[in-house]
């Protein structure tokens, strides 16, 4: 299992503009962002007690979460992701989903997952059954990403953060989301 250092910082809009300029001078744009930015939509899963959210807010040293993610509202590539954190180190495993599989999971129709040969899907199914994980929130944001080959460094700047609580309409590009109050920009430098 290969881990990356992940550190997140809340920054102001002014700091984001300055960082975009400075990073653009020394780092390459992420290959997934041909026009410089891309949209991220994630559907997060948690139990009735919001265990994953509470562990993140409390800074629990070892934790994991599951989400379904797509980019630029393009349903042709949808990922089920398991994100595992050990302190500031993070590791991500993913499995491709069809739009129909994503809809079924979001709606709570998960029995089919027990027959999957994919370890991420099986692990998620196990957590759904043992902990009662269910779709909890949609989070949308705009990401500007930079990469630097030596050291495997990746820096992302996230802005325009929006959410839809208790919504599972993940694949609807017109799903109603609201801005997160006092939404900061997130500066997330990652590296090996």
Enumerate the language-model features and the residues they cover.
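Phosphate-end processing signature that detects enzymes handling 5′-triphosphorylated RNA
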Residues: 1-192
């Amino acid at each position: 299992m290969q881990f990356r250092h992940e550190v997140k910082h809340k920054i102001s809009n002014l700091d984001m503009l300055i960082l975009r300029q400075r990073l653009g001078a020394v780092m390459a744009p992420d290959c997934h962002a041909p026009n410089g930015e891309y949209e991220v939509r994630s559907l997060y899963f948690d139990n009735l007690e919001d265990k994953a959210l509470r562990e993140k807010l409390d800074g629990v040293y070892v934790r994991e979460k599951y989400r379904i993610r797509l980019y630029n509202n393009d349903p042709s590539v949808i990922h089920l992701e398991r994100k595992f954190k050990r302190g500031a180190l993070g590791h991500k495993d993913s499995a491709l989903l069809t739009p129909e599989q994503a809809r079924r999971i979001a709606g709570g129709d998960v029995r089919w997952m027990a027959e999957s040969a994919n370890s991420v899907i099986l692990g998620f199914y196990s957590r759904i059954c043992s902990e009662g994980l269910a779709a909890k929130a949609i989070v949308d944001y705009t990401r500007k990403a930079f990469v630097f080959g030596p050291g495997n460094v990746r820096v992302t700047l996230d802005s325009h953060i929006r959410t839809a609580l208790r919504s599972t309409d993940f694949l609807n590009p017109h799903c109603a989301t609201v801005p997160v109050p006092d939404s900061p920009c997130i500066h997330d430098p990652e590296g090996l």
